[in-house]
Amino acid sequence: QKQDAQKERKELQELISEIAHQMRTPLTNLKNYLDFLSEEIEKKGTEPELSYLKAIQSSEEKIYFLTEHFIRISRLEHGLIQIRKEERDLLKTLRNALGQILDQAEKKEIRFEFELPEKMHVMHDANWLGEAIFNLLDNAVKYTPTGGSVHVSVAQWEMYVEIKVSDTGKGISESNQASIFKRFYREEEIHNQPGVGIGLYLTREIVTQQGGYVTVESQVGKGSAFSIFLPR
């Protein structure tokens, strides 16, 4: 039975890898063609042509983003991802995630407020935890109005280390708070925002596999606070 399970696991890993390859290859080719066209149109094209091209590039980026998320979810759900926990600098992992969101925040004139210790080391997989933190930051920036603020803090408790991301957005109704970590779940009020509702689901899966958990506190009209708790 153990050998059969290992064989099935190997076959599933190979299947997902093949699907990933088949999906990524045409998207990579498309991106290369679009980059080439972009250079040519910027030199000789008209404003409408450039506008159409940017719309196509934006769509390609969204498809690639979704593809990567679906592949990650498939691997996580089937236990095909090996979480490599080591004692690492948590603040470095946080800074790396912040670096990926700064441009988006600057466009909306969102300011960050920090409440961080001088240093904090904790057992975690830096790559996967970084993705989980990025998802929380991305949501905070996405749902905070222009000119608002996002508060980021790290605190140490008796059993856990807490990473909290608080926004000044619309908030989440109490009746919806239990559902937001489900796959593809999105509140009716936020359907005008980009995304398909898998970021929080992926965040919870990543954190759970590292022995932690995720919580949310929110008030409609006042914003939301998401916390990642990791064992010390």
What does each of the following model-derived ranges do?
Residues G147-M159:
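Short beta-strand/loop element within the Bergerat-fold HATPase_c
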Residues G212-Y213:
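Conserved glycine-rich
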Residues S58-I63:
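Short alpha-helical segment of the dimerization/phosphotransfer core of two-component systems
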Residues A140-V141:
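Short helix-loop "hinge" at the ATP-lid/N-box region of the Bergerat-fold HATPase_c
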